[in-house]
């Protein structure tokens, strides 16, 4: 846990109770992503873990898309692992508190449970505060880990739900990278910004995602078209337009 992360009262004991009662290898709390306004009032986005129960490959295929698309798979702090599973992940060289660690743990777990009554508080990501030149590399690594998990379950996933969830995870991460590049204060020149944008848009993983989602992109927002056409200038324009519409409360999808 980081210094600005915390459990609500009794949350940890409730997670321990679930782990003991169900012999769960992984217990996921509900996560509250908090931000504070100028008046120090808290505004939260809640990722609910109440309905998570995975005890087989078929239930993994059914439940994992919810973890991915709901955002919980990326919330790697505050998760409870059994000691044998935790040590197995470390022995494979998986870095703790990464999606890679979480994905490998999910692939090895016999039972995964959510604890809706436990709430873990974390600071909501602030994409526009500062430019992060390593962000795209992390998103790529995270998606690769989810792709590998989906591949390991491909026989049970005849409908391709995990692959689709992984594609949408990558799209959301790519949009976040574009927003960080376009909207954060930084000293990056317009030439470098365009070069970074083009590298992301022309990356093989991006083109794979576009091909996979071209017939299933409803609801993905303004940026799918510019990303699909690999036009950096259009991406910049639509990013600023989406930010303006979000501030005014208008819909962008």
Question: What annotation goes with each model-predicted range?
Answer:
Residues 5, 23-24, 183-253:
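Membrane-interface aromatic/basic loop that binds lipid-linked glycans or pyrophosphate carriers
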Residues 5-115, 122-135:
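Donor-binding/catalytic cores of nucleotide-activated saccharide
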Residues 59-64, 161, 196, 208:
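Exposed alpha-helical structural elements
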Residues 75, 140-143, 168:
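Alpha-helix N-cap/helix-start motif at coil-to-helix transitions, marked by capping-box chemistry
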Residues 117-126, 131-158, 176, 180-206:
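Catalytic core of nucleotide-sugar-dependent glycosyltransferases
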Residues 160-179:
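Amphipathic alpha-helical protein-interaction segments enriched in hydrophobic
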